Each structure stands twice: as C-alpha cells, then as structure tokens.
C-alpha cells in the first residue's frame, strides 16, 4: 500500500489531515503559484493542486501525494492574503454584507501508477454587515494577515458571518476531507480501515 504525502507546509492542512488518523508525511512542493493571464479561479486552483502533487513524484515514487490550493473570490476578483493590517481592514470592509467564494483545488496523485484524481470544491461565506469598529477589533485580535480573505473561520472569524454554504466545512480551512476520502477509497485506501 502506498504511503501518503501531503504536498504542503500549511499547519492548517496538516491539522485537517490529522483528523483522519492515518499516517502521512508533509513535504514542501516547489511550484510557481503565479496565475496565468486570463486564468479563471477554478482553473487556477486545479492547476496548482495538481502541480503541487506531481512536483513531489520524483522524491516519492511509490506514494499517494495530496496537493491542494485555495483562493478567495469577491466580486469576481481574487482576494489574496492581506499581509498588512490596513489591507486586512480593506478586504473585510469590502466583504461586509457580501458573499465571498472560496475555491479549493484538490489533487491525489499516485506516483507509482501515474493515476491523477482532481476536484474543485466551492464554499460560500456570507458576511454579515460589519461596522468599522468590529473590523478594527477583529484585525487587532486575530491578526489574519496570512489568511486569504483576511479571516480565520476556525477562530473568531466565525463571528463575522451570517451563514456558510458548502459540502464540507473543512474546505473553507483548505483541505476538502470528504472529497479526499472518496479519492483515497478509489485508490483502495479506506481511511476507516487503516
């Protein structure tokens, strides 16, 4: 049975995969994440998830390699990580009262057989109307500077929302576990029987 590799250094993805209680290792993929000109959000996350998984095939030739990538879209524009408090406040002000869609690309690559499975999971976050004071307090308390969309749903960010819509709440954090379990079973790797 091939071993599992998570092609990520994200502590959030690692924590999500640990929920399945199956053994795995993490490895950093070497992938240029620059969008191609005119590339749609779904195509971008699908391409990057696939590239991350396949980039580790030479190092891990008999493994199931999991690649994932996520972007945040508001009003048709990709919203990246804010990196500064001012940018985080701007992103949250723009999201206030609106719907932000997260697209998470998932790829499972069997480096022994060359079999590749991919999927894109959308997840909608409906923001409630936020006051400037609420936005300031949230940014000060959570420091969401390295989070797409400027929030952490697994923390205080939940207080920003009116409702969430999607098949798998893990998708919002960065790794759609329901889809991943389906892919693993198709490879003969049932997480319940490991």
From Swiss-Prot:
Major place of residence: cytoplasm
GO BP annotations listed: nucleotide metabolic process
Domain of life: Bacteria
Reactions listed under catalytic activity: N(7)-methyl-GTP + H2O = N(7)-methyl-GMP + diphosphate + H(+)
SUPFAM superfamilies for the chain: ITPase-like (SSF52972)
EC number(s) stated in the UniProt entry for this protein: 3.6.1.-
Gene3D superfamilies: 3.90.950.10
CDD domains: Maf (cd00555)
InterPro entries: ITPase-like_fam, Maf-like
Record-level GO cellular component terms: cytoplasm
Subcellular location: Cytoplasm
Catalytic residue positions: 69 (proton acceptor)
GO MF, one annotated term: nucleoside triphosphate diphosphatase activity
Pfam family, one: Maf
Assigned protein family: Belongs to the Maf family. YceF subfamily.
Function as written in the Swiss-Prot or TrEMBL entry: Nucleoside triphosphate pyrophosphatase that hydrolyzes 7-methyl-GTP (m(7)GTP). May have a dual role in cell division arrest and in preventing the incorporation of modified nucleotides into cellular nucleic acids.
Protein name: 7-methyl-GTP pyrophosphatase
Organism: Salmonella choleraesuis (strain SC-B67)
Organism taxonomic ancestry: Bacteria, Pseudomonadati, Pseudomonadota, Gammaproteobacteria, Enterobacterales
């Amino acid at each position: 049975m091939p071993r599992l590799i998570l092609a990520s250094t994200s502590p959030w993805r690692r924590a999500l995969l640990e929920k399945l209680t199956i053994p795995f290792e993490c490895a950093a993929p070497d992938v240029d994440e620059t969008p191609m000109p005119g590339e749609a959000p779904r195509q971008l996350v699908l391409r990057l998830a696939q590239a991350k998984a396949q980039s580790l095939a030479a190092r891990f030739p008999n493994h199931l390699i999991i690649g994932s990538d996520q972007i945040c879209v508001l009003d048709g524009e990709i919203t990246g990580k804010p990196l500064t408090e001012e940018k985080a406040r701007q992103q949250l002000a723009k999201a206030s009262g609106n719907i932000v869609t997260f697209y998470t690309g998932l790829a499972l690559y069997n480096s022994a057989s060359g079999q590749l499975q991919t999927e894109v999971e959308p997840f909608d976050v409906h923001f409630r109307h936020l006051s400037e004071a609420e936005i300031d307090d949230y940014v000060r308390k959570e420091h969401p500077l390295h989070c797409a969309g400027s929030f952490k749903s697994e923390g205080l960010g939940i207080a920003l929302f009116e409702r969430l819509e999607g098949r798998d709440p893990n998708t919002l954090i960065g790794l759609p576990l329901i889809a991943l379990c389906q892919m693993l079973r198709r490879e003969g790797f049932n997480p319940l029987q490991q």
